[in-house]
Each structure stands twice: as structure tokens, then as C-alpha cells.
Amino acid sequence: MKQNIVINIEGLTKTYDEFIAVNEISFDVNKGEVFALLGPNGAGKTTTVEIIECLKTPDNGKVEIFGINLKDKNKQKEIKRKIGVMPQNFNAFDWLTVKENLDYFRNLYDSNISVDELIDRIGLVKKTDSMYKTLSGGMKQRVGIAISLINEPELLFLDEPTAGLDPQARRETWNLIKKLKQQGKTIFLTTHYMEEAQELSDRILIIIEGKIVASGSPSELIENYGGNKSIILKNCDRNILEKKNIQYEIDTESQIHIIFDNNDQLFKILAAVTDDPNVEIEIKKPNLDEAFLNLTGRRINDEGLAK
């Protein structure tokens, strides 16, 4: 296995009776990147991650972590020492403070990490002596991430780290994940939030019903599957566009939209309407949500359900 590859998966398959949860998927995760596994609930994300974390045994396929084959049971402890895990539904002790919780888990893992330093790294200094029960959802997620860092792992698994958080807490958690990447962590992220995957990931693997649908960087997926760029014009004199041979589609009496492929076409449109003081302009760029819709024919709601 190449030196910079942390996870190597080839032909991974896992079934439960007649149900195929993971169907012959293959991918690599590189050192130092944020790798997102994206899909709705039931897509096979959790099963895949639990196999990599040595919690489940695959039916078929090769799984190597840090160059160690998971079939070598004697070396699974070595793998576990190098990984940190924050499951979606992690537990901490309600009536212990942040510091007391982290002290407990440090002793449990027999770690030498400084709890005070960890609290500082994770941005919880002001909550050091606050009971876990009193924390906001975003602060509780930070505690979960801190617990996953107790053993100073090289590879960090974050399972739906912002599920249920409000927009501000979600963005604060994103900033923390970016900071962890800057510190050299390899991060394996499972999420059903398109914006989250687009914001954080170096590479994304989209799976549906246990099968890989597409993979690539956010920009590659958007470029290949996101559809056309468009410009929306409100209160525009359509005669101006017609004189310039610019084709448009009517949305409403006061709004039209124009699809364009490149900047030259965009500049032509803008030049035509720029002198009109009444026109309102909005440029719409394709995003990961549109790419996912075009790939799968469905969207994912906030509960992770395909619709």
C-alpha cells in the first residue's frame, strides 16, 4: 500500500441475511485529508465505517488500515490505538463537568494527554467546570470530539458530527474540524448534509443502497453533475436581450432566467443589462445538492431521509 494511503478498501461487501448493506465498494483515504462518505440513512455508511473501525467483520473484500489487513486479528489492537471515534449518539456523564468527563476517559484509555491542553484545543476553556448536562448541543458535540482525541489518534472518525445542531453551532463545529485537519489529522466524515460535505471535504464518496454512485472532490462532482449555471433577472427589459440575441426563459411576469456555459456568455448578458437601473441580478451556481439530485434523482432532508 502506498505510504500516503491510510485506508484501502477493495470489493467490500457486507450482508445481513438477504439484505446487502454494502455491495462491493472500493476506495482509498489519503493521509491528512477530510474524506466524506455521503448518503441518506440506510445507504451503508454506518456499516462501512463500523467495519473499518474493527467493530464488524466483512463478508468479502480487503480492508487495510495503516497498511494492516483487518483479517490479521492480532494487529487490530494496533489499529485501534491509532484511531479516534465520535459516534453519532455518543454518551458522556450528565453530572460530571467537562474536565471530569475528559479525565474519566483519559484514565479509561490510559492516555498521557493533558486534559487542560485538550480543552484549550477544542475550544471549551470557558466550559471547563460546567456540567455536561447544562451544555448546548454544539458544546456537547465538542466534548464528543474531545473524547475521540483522548488517545491522540492519527485517524479520526466523525459520524454525523453536526446532526441536530442549529446553523451557528454547525458552523462552529465545521471550524473545529478544519482546525483538526490543520493539525495533521486524517478525518473520515459521514454525513447526509450536502453543504457540510461541500464545505469540509477534500474528497467525497456518494453511496446509495450500498453501492458507489460517484466519487471525487466537491468541485469535480459539481462540475460533472451539478448542471448548468444560470442568471436570474428581475424587472429586465426583454427587448434589450432580444436585440443582443440572448435567449431566455420566463419564470414569472417580472422574472426570467438565462442558462450560460462560460464567463464570456455571462459577461455578454451583464453588459446587455448593466445600464438598466431597475434590473435585479442573481447568479446561481450549481452546488453539491444539485449534483446529488442529478446523480440519484432524489434529495436528502435534515433527518437524513431520501425524498
Protein language model regions, located:
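ABC transporter nucleotide-binding domain
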Residues: 174-261
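Catalytic Walker B motif of ABC-type/P-loop ATPase nucleotide-binding domains
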Residues: 156-160
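Short, charged/small-residue-rich alpha-helical element at the C-terminal edge
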Residues: 229-299
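Conserved ABC ATPase "signature" region
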Residues: 103, 107, 112-128
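Helix-to-loop junction immediately C-terminal to a conserved catalytic motif
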Residues: 53
